[in-house]
């Protein structure tokens, strides 16, 4: 997985940077380097998630509560949009009732969008700056990414794609589409 990715990135002329797996050192290095892409294991994303929550809650007294509310709104908004645009991991034919019902989901979207926008202004942009400010796509492999982390990062504007492969057979067999992600899945076979 890692070696195949390194060879590909070197082939296309991308600069590679390495850091220690300690989250505090990793976040400091990310601020210095401003990466656009990062391939890691789910444990690193879990550590980044915990560092984000710790950082937000330590800033002001009520910041943690507001961050939780705005994160909930952004996650709910993203989930509703996934249902509306048929980006769910259910693999059966949609009924007429489903198509009619999905149109009514625009109503809560209208009410949730301002909360997501406020959260983006005050919190989510700061979180993206913790990752260097230019971060575009994070790749997770080597284990299943917990759905909670997948929803969190995608809802605050950090796209994660999940890949699957065995080093012994084929380093990367499947990878999620970054433009139309279906959360909780590993995507199509390459």
Descriptions of predicted regions:
Residues 1-12:
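Conserved coil-to-alpha-helix start sites within the AMP-binding
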Residues 10-11, 17-190:
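Conserved adenylate-forming
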């Amino acid at each position: 997985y890692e070696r195949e990715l390194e060879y590909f990135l070197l082939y296309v002329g991308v600069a590679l940077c390495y850091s220690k797996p300690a989250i505090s050192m990793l976040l400091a290095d990310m601020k210095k380097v401003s990466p656009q892409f990062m391939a890691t294991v789910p444990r690193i994303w879990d550590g980044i998630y915990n560092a984000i929550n710790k950082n937000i809650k330590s800033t002001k007294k009520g910041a943690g509560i507001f961050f939780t509310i705005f994160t909930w709104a952004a996650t709910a908004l993203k989930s509703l949009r996934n249902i509306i645009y048929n980006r769910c991991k259910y693999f059966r034919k949609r009924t007429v009732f489903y198509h009619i019902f999905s149109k009514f989901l625009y109503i809560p979207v209208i009410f949730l969008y301002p909360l997501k926008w406020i959260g983006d202004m005050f919190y989510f942009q700061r979180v993206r700056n913790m990752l260097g400010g230019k971060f575009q796509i994070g790749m997770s492999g080597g284990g299943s990414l917990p759905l909670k982390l997948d929803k969190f990062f995608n809802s605050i504007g950090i796209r994660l794609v999940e890949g699957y492969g065995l080093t012994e057979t084929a380093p990367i067999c499947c990878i999620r589409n970054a433009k139309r992600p279906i959360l909780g899945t590993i995507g199509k076979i390459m």
